[in-house]
UniProtKB/Swiss-Prot annotation:
Cell wall formation. Catalyzes the addition of glutamate to the nucleotide precursor UDP-N-acetylmuramoyl-L-alanine (UMA). The keyword ATP-binding applies. This is UDP-N-acetylmuramoylalanine--D-glutamate ligase. InterPro entries: Mur-like_cat_sf (IPR036565), Mur_ligase_C (IPR004101), Mur_ligase_C_dom_sf (IPR036615), Mur_ligase_cen (IPR013221), MurD (IPR005762). Pathway: Cell wall biogenesis; peptidoglycan biosynthesis. It comes from Streptococcus pneumoniae serotype 19F (strain G54).
Amino acid sequence: MKVIDQFKNKKVLVLGLAKSGESAARLLDKLGAIVTVNDGKPFEDNPAAQCLLEEGIKVITGGHPLELLDEEFALMVKNPGIPYSNPMIEKALAKGIPVLTEVELAYLISEAPIIGITGSNGKTTTTTMIGEVLTAAGQHGLLSGNIGYPASQVAQIATDKNTLVMELSSFQLMGVQEFHPEIAVITNLMPTHIDYHGLFEEYVAAKWNIQNKMTAADFLVLNFNQDLVKDLASKTEATVVPFSTLEKVDGAYLEDGQLYFRGEVVMAANEIGVPGSHNVENALATIAVAKLRGVDNQTIKETLSAFGGVKHRLQFVDDIKGVKFYNDSKSTNILATQKALSGFDNSKVVLIAGGLDRGNEFDELVPDITGLKKMVILGQSAERVKRAADKAGVAYVEATDIADATRKAYELATQGDVVLLSPANASWDMYANFEVRGDLFIDTVAELKE
């Protein structure tokens, strides 16, 4: 870890705990800052706040009192999940207090080169693929960021012999100023998190922050399958390296079933260890990064062939009497579910879908669900999903929760079929996050097998 003194004796407010806030508070304390932590959860129900207080860090819990900002803070570090419309953040900005997220802190202290991955879908799988390929090549990829390991925590243990592979959400990228990866990847961009950003343009702008400090010496890996992303290529100072399954590009591409990098075959598409056209795109992005980092083709091929996927991302769970169960709980939007379905024969799929109602209609999903064996629909968005099923001519049943949905899907399936949890919706109407939803699916499958 680089020792920096820019926070020494500075008063810093950490707004919101969870993993990233807790990590940021400890790091800032270590760097000599005078840290105050403010979290909305009551102290008695807040083990993170209790631990920080025991470590000598000031904590204020149970709400976000605006008068707290009457103190002269030099900086606010906010939890990524707290929107900029929060009154505390609005007041801080009005007072001229800089507002950052902890990935900025991670960048400032990291001795390791940074590869940043963002996008609407495919971030976690691509991040994991890149980390595994680099580690296999002796470059010791350390995963961090939105993938579940706070960037500021991992950066403290990273050395110049590691590579910091960061999954970055739009929430995190809104709060960067000096953040400067050597390689950045944008997997795709589609309307999501509009409830947080307000406008799709604001969401895209947040994602685009990943390249703000990049120069021609850095590489920006872009998905040329998508016109929106392709059009961004002319708006960066970085050297653009494209990937595509639709055209031959000066980067990584698919042609006649083979994955190429700049004219050289790396591996066959059907050798990738996980199914689906979206995973071909993820593999191409990984190949581009790996080749830019000097990894040989054999290492790339062996690693991607052995890749078993990521939990909750089209994860194979089990086979019960010839019925295969896949957990794709991370599919919280339409595009993700479209990608998941592309890897299967619809006539053999029982799809579990539905969740938080964000006001979306699901007409875009109609061509992709046409021909499904059956659907099991649940959640706040059930009526909207049912309308799409009716348009597609797909029979469905309703379920009360994930356990009920899993049991009903199994009853509808026969030998050779697939039960696919790919909700096309966020989980927050019923569950704290997609991980909880996916774990309940996995647990129910285990019960069915008993």
